[in-house]
Design a protein with these regions (language model features):
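Conserved ATP-binding/catalytic motifs of P-loop helicase motor domains
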Residues: 1-230
Length: 230
């Protein structure tokens, strides 16, 4: 499958989000993905549009004042359910009503949700809304960076990525790639970070990093940051 990636500004991406199409909002760290997502959420709430604000993890959900997609959809830790099991699941108090009334579903940190669970979510939404269209015809906005955090599945060491799911392929996803960096203004350092992110760090990148090793810090006002793996 060939995916057309359009690099754009936040303003351009915001216009696409408001158009009603299904969107994958992505970009490297510091390009304002979560900022734009929160702006879109505020816009939808102002318009009185029913939205589901979710993320693949609890920590990510707190950044957008939402809940986990596992909780919102009722799937919990399951990665597969039969049609009968989905029907039974939707008998839970308020679950079917919540999904049925949702017009826009937002999932942040989509990279950590594996393909099987995105397919399951698609099935649950279709059942709840009584529609065979992708995600029951609701607009779906997925945000994240597949270069950062991989999907997590305790049963599978190499779970498939969300974009490998049937649900993703059938949803006619528009990819919005934010490329303006707001967290850094050092173009050289941004280049190094992007090379590492894209697995393109060659000898030139390595030499630039090695040049910083054991370099004396002359300014007494600088308190160097120390990073540890544990």
């Amino acid at each position: 499958m060939v995916v057309k990636i359009s690099k754009m500004t936040q303003a351009q991406a915001f216009k696409i989000l408001k158009s009603g199409c299904n969107v994958f909002l992505t970009g490297s760290a510091g390009t304002g993905k979560t900022f734009l997502l929160n702006k879109f959420i505020a816009y939808l709430r102002k318009k009185k549009i029913n939205i589901g604000v979710t993320a693949s993890t609890g920590i990510a959900a707190t950044h957008i004042d939402g809940r986990t997609i596992h909780s919102w959809s009722g799937m919990g830790i399951k990665d597969k359910l039969t049609d009968k099991e989905i029907e039974q699941l939707l008998r839970k108090d308020k679950l079917q009503t919540r999904i049925k009334e949702t017009q826009v579903l937002i999932i942040d940190e989509i990279s950590m949700l594996d393909a099987s669970r995105l397919d399951l979510l698609d099935s649950i939404c279709k059942f709840a809304k009584g529609s065979f269209l992708p995600f029951g015809k609701m607009q779906i906005i997925m945000c994240g960076d597949f270069f950062q955090l991989p999907p997590v599945d305790s049963k599978n060491e190499n779970p498939a990525f969300a974009y490998e799911s049937s649900a993703w392929k059938n949803a006619d996803i528009k990819t919005c790639y934010l490329d303006k960096q707001y967290r850094q203004n050092d173009r050289g350092f941004i280049g190094i970070l992007n090379n590492i992110r894209n697995n393109q760090a060659g000898e030139d990148t390595l030499m630039k990093l090695k040049a910083r090793l054991h370099q004396a810090i002359k300014l007494k006002t600088i308190n160097p940051i120390k990073l540890y793996t544990h």
